[in-house]
Amino acid sequence: MMGLPANTRIWIAAGVTDLRRGFTGLSAQVQTKLEQNPFSGHVFVFRGRRGDLIKVLWFDGDGLCLFAKRLERGRFVWPQATSGTVSLTRAQLSMLLEGIDWRRPERTWEPQLSV
């Protein structure tokens, strides 16, 4: 995971994004559709149409960073809204990147005592 400064906000871009876009295209989308500054130091997360690929745009103070992750199975959980942004915590971002439902995390395995 990236070492984010303490005051960094994490924004999910609701809806579907054309992930053929790179630094320039995603920065323009942050400015026009999300009405944010891509050089603010905040993290912006985008999801493609199929839902198995996300891109993360972040300005680290020296330059823009663009990270991508594709799930081999399943889809990333995404907000139902078709436009705007949703704010995440760092823990929720970690869950999102692992393919976990960050809206309602549940324990899927509980250890059993040996008898």
What is the predicted role of each segment?
Residues 1-115:
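Polybasic/polar functional segments that serve as interface/processing modules
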